[in-house]
Amino acid sequence: MDSLLMNRRKFLYQFKNVRWAKGRRETYLCYVVKRRDSATSFSLDFGYLRNKNGCHVELLFLRYISDWDLDPGRCYRVTWFTSWSPCYDCARHVADFLRGNPNLSLRIFTARLYFCEDRKAEPEGLRRLHRAGVQIAIMTFKDYFYCWNTFVENHERTFKAWEGLHENSVRLSRQLRRILLPLYEVDDLRDAFRTLGL
């Protein structure tokens, strides 16, 4: 685990949702873990991680939370803000982990979509996460503002959007929607068949 708060310049560089993210070879993951008790929730931990020694950050987080003694009788909500969406292998590990821990839910807000040039399996990884109940969305100004005030050593500076933040968020949201769209259509068809008694 690194220091509790991320350096301001590092956050702006790593999380910037630019179309061509040249040189950004690491994934950063800011997280919040909450325990839900009926209508209220309690923050248990927050911080950030990054890839280390060739190990992807998603797997580092799974190792980290596996060391906790999570009460199977309580519900936990984990929220990630990531600089890149998970690769196919990490998505598979996360989905398997969630299946083994049904009392834990995960939301992922990502700055950019990761696509490995040689495999093109990453969209299927995102669909697999979605099927496992993970809520996946692209970061918007509101999410960047929250991260800036929660995870960044900002020295009381106000978060300022860079040129193109909104447009890139919209573009990436549409792309993510197209990736997940087949799932929505299949769910709609299943509901229609059930309604018709087929």
From Swiss-Prot:
Residues 39-42 are annotated as: Important for interaction with CTNNBL1. A motif (Nuclear export signal) lies at residues 183-198. The keyword Nucleotide-binding does not apply. Ser-38 is the major site whereas Thr-27 is the minor site of phosphorylation. Phosphorylation regulates its class-switch recombination activity. The keyword Zinc-finger does not apply. Induction: Negatively regulated by microRNA-155 (miR-155). Changing residue 174 to S: In HIGM2; uncertain significance. Gene3D superfamilies: Cytidine Deaminase, domain 2. It holds the Pfam family APOBEC_N. Changing residue 193 to A: Completely abolishes nuclear import. Little affect on nuclear import. Greatly impaired nuclear import. Almost completely abolishes nuclear import. Residues 2-26 are annotated as: Interaction with SUPT6H. InterPro entries: APOBEC/CMP_deaminase_Zn-bd (IPR016192), APOBEC_Cyt_Deaminase (IPR050610), APOBEC_N (IPR013158), CMP_dCMP_dom (IPR002125), Cytidine_deaminase-like (IPR016193). GO terms for biological process: B cell differentiation; cellular response to lipopolysaccharide; cytidine deamination; cytidine to uridine editing; defense response to bacterium; defense response to virus; DNA cytosine deamination; isotype switching. Its cofactor is Zn(2+). The modification Phosphothreonine is found at residue 27. Zn(2+) binds at residues 56, 87, 90. Changing residue 24 to W: In HIGM2; completely abolishes nuclear import and interaction with CTNNBL1, diminishes interaction with KPNA1 and abolishes immunoglobulin class switching. SUPFAM superfamilies: Cytidine deaminase-like. It is linked to Immunodeficiency with hyper-IgM 2: A rare immunodeficiency syndrome characterized by normal or elevated serum IgM levels with absence of IgG, IgA, and IgE. It results in a profound susceptibility to bacterial infections. Interacts with CTNNBL1; the interaction is important for the immunoglobulin switch activity of AICDA. Interacts (via its NLS) with KPNA1. Interacts with PKA/PRKACA and PRKAR1A/PKR1. Interacts with TRIM28 and NCL. Interacts with SUPT6H. Interacts with RNF126. Directly interacts with MCM3AP; this interaction may favor AICDA recruitment to immunoglobulin variable region genes, hence promoting somatic hypermutations. Belongs to the cytidine and deoxycytidylate deaminase family. PANTHER family: MRNA EDITING ENZYME (PTHR13857), SINGLE-STRANDED DNA CYTOSINE DEAMINASE (PTHR13857:SF10). This is Single-stranded DNA cytosine deaminase. It comes from Homo sapiens (Human).
